[in-house]
């Protein structure tokens, strides 16, 4: 089985919002990604609406259903609703995405940079996971590879974990990947042993994705946005998505 590519289109919305109006068009970008072979689309609507907004979520939900690809909504389940942001659970109830990825990021964070601490978040998180699964969606939890209790995600009711790959990307850029890859491979094995599916994301790129998949068995999905959109500035969006799909086809799950 080939690892699936879900393209995160947040950065398209960042560029649109920086000027106002509707250009570049998030929906058109998503269509291009799907036509080029992306298996899904990811968004991370934040309460401050810095990029993806509630209206985008609704429109992208319809688009992904039309094209029979998966829709993955990321977000902080603890963030309360506010003006323009109905809350993650309400957005998911309105769209029923194939996957909901829960991420413990605060309002002031530039980007997601750590996973859940199951020692602190358990009771409320278990209740929230049950509520999200009642929507009919698969639930994935954002976790650090070094988390000693990755299996705890299964006990809380999650279906998958998404390994936060930022530390691996930094290690790869510095030419020191062995220790990082060993850590992620171990995390993958522990997740699989607990019956959890494995996703991965954050700072994955054409330069480092192949090495990661070769070392970490069983990755079902990668969510890639920042690097992909940056590369697309030089290579074109369609060509960039096709390049990622080619990398994934060369790295079979479980190989």
UniProtKB/Swiss-Prot annotation:
Single biological process term from Gene Ontology: pyridoxine biosynthetic process
Annotated site residues (Transition state stabilizer) in this chain: 162
Pathway where it operates: Cofactor biosynthesis; pyridoxine 5'-phosphate biosynthesis; pyridoxine 5'-phosphate from D-erythrose 4-phosphate: step 5/5
Catalytic activity: 3-amino-2-oxopropyl phosphate + 1-deoxy-D-xylulose 5-phosphate = pyridoxine 5'-phosphate + phosphate + 2 H2O + H(+)
Molecular function in Gene Ontology: pyridoxine 5'-phosphate synthase activity
Annotated positions binding 3-amino-2-oxopropyl phosphate: 8, 19, 203, 225-226
Domain of life: Bacteria
UniProt GO cellular component terms: cytosol
Group of enzyme by EC: transferase
Binding site for 1-deoxy-D-xylulose 5-phosphate: 46, 51, 111
Enzyme Commission no: 2.6.99.2
InterPro entries, alphabetized: Aldolase_TIM, PyrdxlP_synth_PdxJ, Pyridoxine-5'_phos_synth
Pfam family, one: PdxJ
Residues at the active site: 44 (proton acceptor), 74 (proton acceptor), 202 (proton donor)
Keyword Manganese in annotation: no
HAMAP family with a match to the protein in the record: PdxJ
Family: Belongs to the PNP synthase family.
Record function comment: Catalyzes the complicated ring closure reaction between the two acyclic compounds 1-deoxy-D-xylulose-5-phosphate (DXP) and 3-amino-2-oxopropyl phosphate (1-amino-acetone-3-phosphate or AAP) to form pyridoxine 5'-phosphate (PNP) and inorganic phosphate.
NCBIfam families recorded: pdxJ, PRK05265.1-4
Assembly with partners or alone: Homooctamer; tetramer of dimers.
Protein name from the UniProt record: Pyridoxine 5'-phosphate synthase
Gene designation: pdxJ
């Amino acid at each position: 089985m080939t690892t699936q590519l879900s393209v995160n289109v947040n950065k398209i919305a960042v560029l649109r919002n920086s000027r106002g109006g509707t250009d570049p068009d998030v929906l058109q970008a998503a269509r291009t990604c799907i036509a080029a072979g992306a298996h899904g689309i990811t968004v991370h609507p934040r309460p401050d609406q810095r990029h993806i907004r509630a209206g985008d979520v609704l429109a992208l939900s319809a688009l992904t259903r039309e094209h029979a690809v998966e829709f993955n909504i990321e977000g902080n389940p603890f963030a309360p609703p506010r003006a323009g942001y109905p809350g993650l659970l309400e957005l998911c109830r309105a769209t029923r995405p194939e996957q909901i990825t829960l991420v413990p990021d605060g309002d002031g964070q530039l980007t997601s940079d750590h996973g859940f601490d199951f020692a602190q978040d358990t009771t409320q998180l278990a209740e929230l996971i049950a509520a999200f699964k009642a929507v009919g969606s698969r639930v994935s939890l954002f976790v650090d590879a070094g988390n000693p209790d990755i299996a705890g995600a299964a006990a809380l009711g999650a279906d998958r974990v998404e390994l936060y790959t930022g530390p691996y990307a930094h290690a790869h850029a510095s030419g020191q990947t062995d220790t990082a890859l060993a850590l992620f491979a171990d995390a993958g094995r522990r997740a699989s042993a607990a019956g959890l599916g494995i996703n991965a994301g954050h700072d994955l790129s054409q330069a480092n994705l192949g090495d990661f998949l070769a070392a970490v068995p069983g990755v079902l999905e990668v969510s890639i946005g920042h690097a992909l959109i940056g590369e697309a500035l030089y290579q074109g969006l369609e060509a960039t998505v096709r390049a990622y799909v080619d990398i994934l086809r060369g790295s079979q799950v479980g190989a």
